[in-house]
Amino acid sequence: MKASSVLLGLAPLAALAAPTPEAELSARQAQQSIDALMKAKGKLYFGTATDQGLLNTGKNSAIIKADFGQVTPENSMKCQSLENTRGQYNWAPADALVNFAVSNNKSIRGHTLIWHSQLPGWVNNINDRNQLTTVIQNHVATVMGRWKGKIRAWDVVNEIFNEDGTMRQSVFSRVLGEDFVRIAFEAARKADPNAKLYINDYNLDRPNAGKLTKGMVGHVKKWVGAGVPIDGIGRQGHLQSGQGNGLGQGIKGLGDSGVKEVGGNELDIQGNNGNEFGGGNKACLPVPACVGIPAWGVRDNDSWRPQGNPLLFDSNYNPKPAYNSVVQALK
């Protein structure tokens, strides 16, 4: 048999053995998985935000499997997405994310139960204290109950402070005052006693800012002291270039509030030079309460604010200098 015939005979076998692009991507990224590096430093995860549509797009799911140990639903668990009509739930998109995470051994952060934005009109129109209390309790119990035991942590209340540390005006604060925080957290603890319960907000990166000191830290200390079951504070990080340098002080300030956990949530940095992403993750390492950092997405053009290339991967799913800076910061 001629050599050419042998080669031709082997060609189909070689084609069958050739790895798929997704397999090649997984193998390449897993060699320096940022989630594995974060866990090697004693933390719980390096995470990202995604949803059903993104998981079915391009190489998103392959990168998440290889590089990220935690997922947060970007929109599918918000009230308007889940219960736009009272008592009628749209579970499919969030179920898809939970099923993906469970089947791939990823931790899940539920986001978010009580938020003034992306809120159905029927909730905003409530004026009766007892009615709103019941709505909060039922929504929390129903949503958390569906995935009880599958979701590690929940953002129970989200973005409730103004920049000066006062409470934001919303239907919740208007009708219930700040007592809606207690109502929501007590309902959450009852719904899933083993889940970690978080309060989440942005602009908590400046150590002397009113939102951090008077708002988040001051209120959380008071609420925890009164028995409100708050386990952790989520610090969003939707930043501009140059703002990443304050992450360390902000994380430490939150850790001083007395909560058990601090999660650096929703990190993206517009116009970053690469080094700031690494610095933001390194800032978590010396703070015992800091359990991990989630980026807010995988690649730039899928970001909620794609201008300024704020994420770790470019539009072709190639790791950027920001990705490499995280790897170096965690080694």
Swiss-Prot record:
Pathway entry: Glycan degradation; xylan degradation
Domain GH10 intervals: 31-329
GO biological process: one example: xylan catabolic process
Keyword Transcription part of the UniProt annotation: no
Catalytic activity: Endohydrolysis of (1->4)-beta-D-xylosidic linkages in xylans
GO CC aspect terms: extracellular region
Residues bearing attached sugar chains per UniProt: N105, N301
Phenotype of the disrupted gene, per the record: Retains 39 percent of the catalytic activity. Double xyl1/xyl2 deletion mutant retains 19 percent of the activity and exhibits a 50 percent reduction in accumulation of total mycelial mass.
Pfam families: Glyco_hydro_10
MF-aspect GO terms: endo-1,4-beta-xylanase activity
Keyword annotations: Carbohydrate metabolism, Disulfide bond, Glycoprotein, Glycosidase, Hydrolase, Polysaccharide degradation, Secreted, Signal, Xylan degradation
InterPro entries: GH10 (IPR044846), GH10_dom (IPR001000), Glycoside_hydrolase_SF (IPR017853)
Cystine pairings recorded for this chain: C284-C290
Active site residues of this protein: E159, E266
Disulfide bond found in the keyword field: yes
Broad class of the protein's primary localization: secreted
Induction: Expressed in presence of rice cell walls or on oat spelt xylan, but not when grown on sucrose.
SUPFAM superfamilies noted in UniProt: (Trans)glycosidases
Location(s), subcellular: Secreted
EC number: 3.2.1.8
SMART domains according to UniProt: Glyco_10 (SM00633)
Family membership: Belongs to the glycosyl hydrolase 10 (cellulase F) family.
Role noted for this protein: Endo-1,4-beta-xylanase involved in the hydrolysis of xylan, a major structural heterogeneous polysaccharide found in plant biomass representing the second most abundant polysaccharide in the biosphere, after cellulose. Accounts for approximately 70 percent of the endoxylanase activity in the culture filtrate.
Record protein name field: Endo-1,4-beta-xylanase 2
